[in-house]
Amino acid sequence: MKLKEVSAIFSQLPEKLLIQLGEETGVDQGVSRLRGALIFKLLIFSMLRSNRLSNRVLEHFYNSELFSAFSGKGGHKTRHSSLASRLSHMKADYFAQLFDWSCKHFAKALSGKNNKLYKQVNRFDSTMCAISSALVDWGMKVGCPPKEGPAKVQVKFTVGLRHLLPSSLDSFFHQNYLSEERALKEAIQKAGPQPEELVIFDLGLKSRKTLKVFDEEGRNFITKGGDNLRYEHIITHRQIKGRSADGLKFIQDCKVHLYVDGHRIMEHPFRLVEAEVEENGKRLYFLSNVWELSAMDIARVYRYRWDIEVFFRFIKQELNVKHLINRSENGIQIQLYTSLITAILLTVFKVNDKIKSFKIAKLKFEEELLLLFMKNHAPSKPT
């Protein structure tokens, strides 16, 4: 089935699956009305229909005729306080399993898109969302506290973006995960190495010991070295000096030992590709444990990392992830998982319908959803 239509995309999330996962996770134990599948549908529906979620917005949509038609829930009404309580206490694992299933299932729908090298890339990065410290007793403190009013605390979530779709999600709520050296490393290791996969991450994770661990685990990676990178040249890997590609002039491609803590050499080989931006002369250093690719492809693959920055901007602006609707860690995880599932649906629609921007894809997706309701629930013509 070509997933160009909203109805075709939603049909890929069958009711049978939602019920089955509900039984396996026990998300509906002791609950008769606000069941897992219904909350999942409410969150997706609300994310598509509103640019600023809140518990009162969820209440409005839940009690609307449009959502009743979308979900098939009947005429049951509820209050925002009941929805907030349910999000705080229902099992987030239900949504985690829906996310894992969606990642694998919809990846098949995009398997023929883009080149082979692009499809091998799994980018990892983190972003932060703020919430008032007066509302919660957890969160990461960043920077100096304000002179007046409560401080903001941060939630960090780290995403893997494989090919065009999110592949993993890790949420961090506590201060010891403020450093990417810990959060990003843990997220990458938790995802597990995949055959032929190229893991891409930025300077936030630069521990030489971690790079060595990744290499020993069989995890292929490409990252960027800092401007003050210190290394010991061992041997030239390939002669590339003077070659140019994609706006870069290449200087060297060699095997090196890296310095640890600025003064001690770690005797573990890494690949260093050094290039210069032709436009402004800025030096770039790419570090990797991948030896088969050309230096040009090493630099090209690292550029694919920018896709995850675009993705974060999309989910924050269009799916309003930056506005957290629940004060519990559990409720926030549910919001994040459902946001990424919604992003998967929109990405599949965007790619298969050849739409350039996420903003337009979301608008068109919502329009087609409303047209589908009108078509299916239009009054019958008198005979």
Model-identified regions with their sequence ranges:
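Major-groove recognition helix of helix-turn-helix-like DNA-binding domains
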Residues: F70-A92
